[in-house]
């Protein structure tokens, strides 16, 4: 799972300094957005983890026994996979490696999801929600950056607003 967090650095190989900074900022935005969304949902949704239903589950010894929804590992893995596949395809649109890179990134993210379910840490709905959250942030942030001046974002004390023009 954490290997996927480092792989966007590979996208910066052979890029100029401005591109490296842009990639770093985009990836930081992706990571922070995914992490914040995951944390907010975990605070709002009080869902026990699957292992708490097993006999002998040590609830009192585990702090996050009720933080099943959504799967944070899955969200961050899919955010990385979405980011990698989108940015790689944008930087190398003619590359024959676009499909293999996308398959590898999403396979690693899917493997993380499966292991979270098999480990008794999450239900299927937890990982599906995490995958959706991660993919939205992972693809959404670089996509917003490519739209450039057509996207405006502003913050108020009560909300975050987006404006998209064509």
Residue ranges and their predicted role:
Residues 1-9:
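Hydrophobic alpha-helical transmembrane segments
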Residues 16-20:
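Membrane-helix interface linkers and caps
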Residues 9-15:
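Conserved, well-structured interaction surfaces
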């Amino acid at each position: 799972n954490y290997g996927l967090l480092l792989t966007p650095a590979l996208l910066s190989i052979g890029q100029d300094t401005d591109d490296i900074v842009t990639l770093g900022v985009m990836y930081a935005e992706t990571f922070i957005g995914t992490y914040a969304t995951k944390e907010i949902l975990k605070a709002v949704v009080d869902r026990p983890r699957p292992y708490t239903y097993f006999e002998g589950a040590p609830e009192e010894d585990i702090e996050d026994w009720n933080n099943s929804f959504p799967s944070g590992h899955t969200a961050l893995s899919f955010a990385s996979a979405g980011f990698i596949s989108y940015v790689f395809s944008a930087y190398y649109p003619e590359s024959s490696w676009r499909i293999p890179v996308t398959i590898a990134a999403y396979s690693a993210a899917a493997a993380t999801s499966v292991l979270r379910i098999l480990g008794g840490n999450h239900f299927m709905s937890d990982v599906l929600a995490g995958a959706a959250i991660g993919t939205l942030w992972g693809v959404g942030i670089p996509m917003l950056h490519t739209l450039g001046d057509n996207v405006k974002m502003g913050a108020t004390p009560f909300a975050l607003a987006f404006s998209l023009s064509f």
